[in-house]
Each structure stands twice: as structure tokens, then as C-alpha cells.
Regions:
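Beta-strand-rich modules
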Residues: 475-497
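Aromatic-lined carbohydrate-binding/catalytic grooves of carbohydrate-active enzymes
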Residues: 70-106, 204, 297
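Polysaccharide-binding and catalytic clefts of secreted carbohydrate-active enzymes
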Residues: 80, 121, 149-294, 303-304
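Active-site-adjacent "subsite" loops/lids of carbohydrate-active enzymes
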Residues: 31, 39-58, 126-182, 281
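Pro/Thr/Ser/Gly-rich low-complexity, intrinsically disordered linker/stalk tracts
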Residues: 391-433, 494-503
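Recognizes extended acidic, P/S/T-rich segments that occur
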Residues: 437-480
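Catalytic domains of carbohydrate-active enzymes, especially glycoside hydrolases
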Residues: 58-84, 182-183, 288, 294-298
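Substrate-binding cleft of secreted/luminal carbohydrate-active enzymes
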Residues: 283-309, 320, 324-406
Length: 503
């Protein structure tokens, strides 16, 4: 008995000490990005290369069901990894990661299917694009590759589209325009691949003559960073013209701007932990994109734990939140769960998310998990992780953060008409170019107060693809008898309008 008591006291002490280490939990915000990377390059996450189309579709559906059931609200689907396409492209060949053969039609349009399936579940889909990468070691040689091969920059085994060439900028703009205009994506996102890491800046550099002949007064490093910035600006401007509600962001390496002189240039504090290898390694300057308002959000890959000496999450992540706030932009921090091995790691990620919620502007933050396979594809452990996140930090659904700098289009406030409950179904009249939020709240709750409580939010609904006059929503069984329901119009910018109620 004494041993049991002693063990119980020890366990209580350990748990109390651990609890003191974690930030006190906050109420989940009503608006927060909750996303995951879906990597298609090398078959990292999806699909199984060469599998039949129906099997690939079924796997994506299983993935999305898991995310939706655990209150995620978006995915980042990689649709261009090696100057290829996971969609019907006018410019580039079908990806080999679909069928095993570059240029071979997979029998369906994966991006169109993914957009449809995400929106059926009230989830956003952000098209993840690698802007420059062409290939590694092996040279692609389809008919559509021939033009690109005349505009390559090589360093070691890496081939990329030459960032200095106007042809490259035009190609990337055209690719992004095609994705934005042909597909109902909610966002465009780049990762952290720009110039090849470690590319020389001396006379041995493959673009040394190009820089010399450009007539610029910039150093070769500044010239390279400006080449990247010109491309980023061109894509941002195109999206604003074509579909101004579509978000555009970049996910750079996790540490930037550790130099005091560079921080002074931007009027910010230097990043307090880690080493900025990207500025002179891949010639990426993320703070310039924030300061220049060339992006809507930054999604830094802060893939280190709290207390890690070389780059402490508790120092680096708040710095990104603060820097994004200074320039009136959003920080959606990318967190790594790639080394998921045991349940003992779960509290670390909950603690990291609490740090983000306390440091990002209210309703302006979010998280992207690297990567999705750890959330649904590790037998037993993935399910436990999702249940843990839902129980501790994702207790309720959430909406996407607003982007007020894009949200300047005046429109007459939409109204939900003919809202009815019939058995387990809500129906209402479709409003063109709108989405909807659905709420369920006890009949004792004041109708003027329900929308301020995130716990009453059931989720978001898109208009049906096939049109028609009515929208339908299935009510969860446990809410049908004692709850009343409200539906609010939600425009493509995320503005929520006055509710309509069931009788």
C-alpha cells in the first residue's frame, strides 16, 4: 500500500510539473486555419503511384473524412511539384506521380476531384505549387518539357526554371492563373524551394554571366532575391485581378532575419533563435514579402520543439506572429509531426498550438501540419493523435480567418431565404457566389448571442456544384430534438452576414 501511495504521489508531482510547463489552454477561436500538407511528390502522402483512379479517389476521400471529423478546415494539396500537373494543364505534362509515366493521363482530374470533395465537406483547398523545380538528376523529356528545357538553371544535380528569365515569371503566372480560373480553389501556396541550396555566388555560379550582363547595380545575392520577389509580386497581382478572394501565401524555411542589419532594414527585431540559412542559401527573403504586401499569409516551417537549443519553437513562432502582425498579414505556422512514434509526443503539439493562439492576432492565426499521412495513415497512432487534438485544441469547428486588406468589395448584404427543417434536413434557397455557416444552439439560448459562441458552430457549407435552387444540410442526430438552427450567408471573402432561423 505504501508503494502505491508513494507512486501515486510521484505521478501527481510529475503531472503537475508537466502541466506547469504547458501554457494554460485558451478557448478555441472562431476563426483559425487548421490544415495539413498533402504531398504528392515521390508519393509521400498521396496518391499511390500507378494505382487505379478509383483507388486513388477512395484514398483521398478517406483522408478528407478523417480530417473533417476532427475539425480540420483545409488542406494544402500539392498540384505542381516538378513543373508537372495534377490537373488538366495547358502548359505542363501530367505528373508521373499519378501513373508512373510523365505525361500520361490518369483517367480523371485529381484537382477537380479534390476541390469537389473538400467543398462537399465545407473544407477549403489550397493549391500547393512549387514554382521553380524542374527535376533532380533525371531530365524530363515529354513534348511539353521541350520548351522549359531551354530555360533551365543547373546547380549540381538540381535543375530549376531560371528565376532571372522573364519566360519563367510568365510561365509561373500562367500556371497559377490556370489553376485559379479553371478550378474553384480557395488559395495558392508555395513551399520553400527557390534557388538551389548552396548555389555559388562566385564566378563559378551558373548564372554569374547572366547577372553580370543584366546591368544591375545589385549584388548577385540581392539580384537573385529580387528575381524571386518579381515573380511573387506578379502572381499576387494576377490573383487580385482574377479572383481577389483567393488567398496567396508562401511557406518559407522556419528561421529568417537573424541579422541585426537586415532586421533594422525592416524595422523589426531579429529572429531570437536559430540561423537564417535561406537568405544567402536559397535567396529567399520572407520579410520582404510581408513588408511589400506581396502575400496574404506566411506559413513558416517551424519544425522544432519547445526548448530546442538551436531553434526554440517558443521563441521562433511568436516572432513570426509578431512580424506578420506588424505588416498586417497573417502567420499560419507549419508544425512537424513527421516523427510521430508514441502518444507521449502529443502534449508537445498542443502546447505549441497554445503558443500560437496567444501570439497571433485574434482570429488571424492557424496551423498547417506536416504532413497528412501522420494524421490518418499510421494504424492506431494517427487515430489517437486526431482524437487528442480534437479533445484538447480542436474541440469545435472553425472558420477561416478574414483577409480585410482584400475584403473591400461593396455588396448588398445577402439573406438566407426559405430556411426550413424537415426531419434530419435543413434546406434553404441558394445564393449565388456564397457559402454558409450553420449553427445549432439550445432553444433556451438568446438568438442575439448564439453566433458569439464557437461551440454552437456546426461548420461551413458550399453551394452544390450542380446548381439548383436549394441547399441541403444534414443535421447531426443528437441535435434534432432540442436545438434550434440558424444559417448565415458567408461570402467568398469570409464575411458572415445576419442569420436566418428555423421556426
Amino acid at each position: 500500500m505504501k508503494r502505491i501511495i508513494a507512486f501515486s504521489l510521484l505521478l501527481t508531482f510529475v503531472l503537475a510539473a508537466f502541466a506547469q510547463r504547458l501554457p494554460q489552454r485558451t478557448m478555441p477561436p472562431k476563426r483559425e486555419l487548421r490544415s495539413a500538407w498533402v504531398s504528392t511528390v515521390w508519393g509521400i502522402d498521396w496518391p499511390k503511384q500507378g494505382a487505379p483512379a478509383e483507388r486513388q479517389k477512395a484514398e483521398l476521400v478517406r483522408m478528407l473524412d478523417s480530417l473533417k471529423n476532427n475539425n480540420f478546415n483545409a488542406i494544402n494539396l500539392q498540384v505542381r511539384s516538378m513543373s508537372d500537373a495534377f490537373y488538366q494543364s495547358s502548359y505542363e505534362p501530367w505528373s508521373s506521380y499519378l501513373t508512373g509515366t510523365r505525361g500520361k493521363h490518369p483517367g480523371y482530374d485529381p484537382l477537380a476531384f479534390a476541390v469537389s470533395e473538400c467543398h462537399k465537406r465545407g473544407m477549403e483547398i489550397h493549391a500547393w505549387i512549387n514554382p521553380y523545380r524542374f527535376c533532380i538528376t533525371k531530365m524530363w523529356n515529354t513534348e511539353r518539357d521541350q520548351e522549359a528545357k531551354r530555360h533551365l538553371l543547373r546547380w549540381g544535380k538540381f535543375y530549376i526554371l531560371d528565376p532571372a528569365q522573364q519566360w519563367t515569371i510568365d510561365r509561373i503566372v500562367n500556371v497559377c492563373r490556370e489553376v485559379v480560373t479553371k478550378y474553384d480553389v480557395d488559395g495558392i501556396l508555395y513551399d520553400d524551394y527557390f534557388y538551389p541550396n548552396g548555389i555559388a555566388s562566385s564566378v563559378a555560379a551558373p548564372d554569374y554571366k547572366e547577372w553580370k550582363n543584366s546591368g544591375t547595380d545589385l549584388s548577385i545575392g540581392d539580384w537573385r532575391r529580387e528575381n524571386v520577389n518579381r515573380m511573387v509580386k506578379a502572381v499576387y497581382d494576377m490573383i487580385k485581378r482574377e479572383k481577389p478572394w483567393v488567398r496567396f501565401g508562401i511557406s518559407p524555411a522556419g528561421v529568417a532575419c537573424t541579422s541585426q542589419s537586415l532586421a533594422d532594414k525592416y524595422g523589426i527585431d531579429p529572429c531570437p533563435s536559430g540561423s537564417d540559412w535561406q537568405y544567402n542559401g536559397i535567396f529567399s527573403d520572407p520579410v520582404s514579402w510581408l513588408k511589400g504586401h506581396l502575400i496574404d499569409f506566411i506559413a513558416p516551417q517551424v519544425y522544432w520543439k519547445i526548448g530546442f537549443k538551436r531553434a526554440d519553437f517558443s521563441l521562433v513562432a511568436p516572432w513570426w506572429c509578431k512580424t506578420a502582425r506588424k505588416f498586417s498579414r497573417q502567420a499560419f505556422v507549419s508544425m512537424c509531426i513527421d516523427k510521430l512514434m508514441t502518444t507521449s509526443e502529443f502534449p508537445e503539439w498542443a502546447a505549441e498550438m497554445e503558443i500560437l493562439r496567444r501570439n497571433c492576432a485574434k482570429d488571424q492565426g492557424g496551423t498547417i501540419f506536416w504532413s497528412v499521412r501522420n494524421l490518418y495513415n499510421k494504424p492506431g497512432l494517427s487515430e489517437q493523435l486526431c482524437h487528442y487534438l480534437k479533445r484538447t485544441v480542436y474541440q469545435y469547428p472553425s472558420l477561416m480567418p478574414l483577409t480585410p486588406w482584400r475584403n473591400n468589395v461593396a455588396r448588398k448584404a445577402p439573406v438566407v431565404n426559405f430556411l426550413k427543417q424537415e426531419g434530419n434536413q435543413l434546406t434553404w434557397q441558394l445564393i449565388p457566389r456564397c457559402r454558409y455557416t450553420v449553427y445549432a444552439f439550445p432553444k433556451t439560448v438568446d438568438k442575439a448571442q448564439f453566433s458569439t459562441e464557437v461551440k454552437y458552430l456546426l461548420g461551413m457549407v458550399y453551394n452544390p456544384e450542380r446548381g439548383g435552387e436549394m441547399v441541403t444540410y444534414t443535421i447531426p442526430a443528437h441535435l434534432r430534438a432540442t436545438y434550434q438552427f440558424a444559417v448565415c450567408p458567408l461570402d467568398r471573402y469570409g464575411n458572415e452576414y445576419a442569420p436566418s432561423f428555423t421556426e
